[in-house]
Amino acid sequence: MYGTSREAARCERWGTIPSRGRCCLKLMPMFSPHGPTLRELTVQALSSVERGYDLLAPKFDHTPFRTPDAVLDAVEGELKGMGSFAHGLDLCCGTGAGTDVLRTVCRESVTGVDFSAGMLSVARARVRSDGPPHVAWVRGDARALPFGPVFDLAVSFGAFGHFLPRELPGLFAEVHSVLRPGGRFVFPIGAPPSPASPWYWALLGFDTAMRVRNALWRPSFVMYYRTFRFGDVRRELTRAGFTVEHRALTDFGHRPDGSPRCRLIVATRT
């Protein structure tokens, strides 16, 4: 396990992931001076998901909502071990952090798709476009992907909280439809924090606040942290036509019960 026993205990207490000798606090409320202000976050939260991310896009990479480099690096290492891919899709690509990962494992093309024009604009500016592989950006809804079965690999990082549980069957069916036979859908999923962890109650409080907000305010802003559960994900992927395996991302260690703190889901289109 990475880090000292004291660090591991601290990470277990807070429900976080030890990484390279430090805790990987993806969702802790820590913002750089270049990040959004509280007022800007409030305006975003009272907007639709699409409009909210358009507003947040210029400062998104300076928030803790961006997938940590430690997670991106771990997934990249696993993908390289699976071999080389021709065409890759970054689902809900945001500012392109996952697209950078795909550029290292795909030979011919990489496509980032997102429904926020603002996030795509930032992605175009920050991700290298000189190929190979060729990099393309598409504005579109992950629930109605504008592609045929052309991809060998699809990845997604940190976006599933924007989909309600009832939307997962349709979402996974869409991904299945754009993969070639044998194509893989790969993404990390973290273990939930223990109820003894303050982080468990912080996430519960956040999700509860969002449910109240969505009951009282329109348009809704779907963003929940406790709805994407491992068992539900595995079941719905199987129903969508995938063969599902999961691997421990060993860089992040294990919980006291021996289960991995972070898993990599590898779903293969059959």
Mark where each language-model region is.
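Core SAM-dependent methyltransferase catalytic element
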Residues: R255-T270
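Short alpha-helix
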Residues: Y224-G241
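Conserved class I S-adenosyl-L-methionine
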Residues: P29-G83, V101, V186-M210
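A short glycine-rich, Lys/Arg-flanked "PGG" loop and its adjoining helix->strand segment in the class I
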Residues: P169-P181
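Conserved S-adenosyl-L-methionine
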Residues: F242-G253
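A conserved beta-strand element that flanks and buttresses the S-adenosyl-L-methionine
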Residues: V155
